[in-house]
From Swiss-Prot:
InterPro entries: NADH_UbQ_OxRdtase-like_20kDa, NADH_UQ_OxRdtase_20Kd_su. This is NADH-quinone oxidoreductase subunit B 2. [4Fe-4S] cluster binds at C47, C48, C113, C142. The keyword NAD applies. Keywords: 4Fe-4S, Cell inner membrane, Cell membrane, Iron, Iron-sulfur, Membrane, Metal-binding, NAD, Quinone, Translocase, Transport, Ubiquinone. NDH-1 shuttles electrons from NADH, via FMN and iron-sulfur (Fe-S) centers, to quinones in the respiratory chain. The immediate electron acceptor for the enzyme in this species is believed to be ubiquinone. Couples the redox reaction to proton translocation (for every two electrons transferred, four hydrogen ions are translocated across the cytoplasmic membrane), and thus conserves the redox energy in a proton gradient. GO terms for cellular component: plasma membrane; respiratory chain complex I. It catalyses: a quinone + NADH + 5 H(+)(in) = a quinol + NAD(+) + 4 H(+)(out). It comes from Anaeromyxobacter sp. (strain Fw109-5). It is found in: Cell inner membrane. Binds 1 [4Fe-4S] cluster. Its main location: membrane.
Length: 183
């Protein structure tokens, strides 16, 4: 049962419209900038690491997608690439690395072992890293071909550009005279 208030037009001020327009432009600009400036932290644990190194070579050139140089501290990265099998003893380490990565952060599961445990179906292997950290893109293969990795990075870039990006998420300051300010 809808009330009469639901049918009334929404009235906005020019300032609210301008803020919405400006936020849209800022969001698109930040999406474009973040899309081409991925600071990766590779968490390499197994044989897929050899194929991962191939992607950075001159033939495939991951640098043209903005994800060239790996960071050696998770605090300097925004993209976690989990390469290979993760066992149960490594799971808390992976979780801690994920928590240390700067916001906004993205995760890529590289290879079938990181995606679903691979052919290691036993008590010591984590059956997919999505049980530990949220995953944005899965790259299949054992090991994945470099072309598949580039497709996965481009898919992640599309996802990043489509997200809503904000500069600062602050509460508005109270206006003097509206209500008393208590500290």
């Amino acid at each position: 049962m809808a009330s009469e208030l639901d049918n009334l037009p929404v009235i906005t001020t020019r300032r609210e419209e301008a803020q919405g327009f400006l936020q849209g432009l800022v969001s698109k600009g930040l999406g474009w900038a973040r899309k081409y400036s991925l600071f990766q932290y590779p968490f390499v644990t197994a044989c897929c690491g050899m194929e991962f190194m191939t992607v950075a070579s001159a033939r495939y050139d991951l640098d043209r997608f903005g994800a060239a140089l790996p960071r050696f501290s998770p605090r300097q990265a925004d993209l976690l690439i989990v390469v290979g099998t993760v066992n149960c003893k490594q799971a808390p380490i992976l979780r801690r690395v994920y928590e240390q990565i700067a916001e906004p952060k993205w995760v890529v599961a590289f290879g079938v072992c990181a995606s679903s445990g691979g052919f290691y179906d036993n008590y010591a292997t984590v059956q997919g890293i999505d049980r530990i950290v949220p995953v944005d893109v899965y790259i299949p293969g054992c090991p994945p071909r470099p072309e598949q990795v580039l497709d996965g990075i481009m898919l992640l870039q599309q996802k990043i550009q489509g997200q809503q990006h904000k500069l600062i998420d602050r509460k508005p300051l109270p206006v003097v005279g509206q209500e008393p300010i208590s500290r």
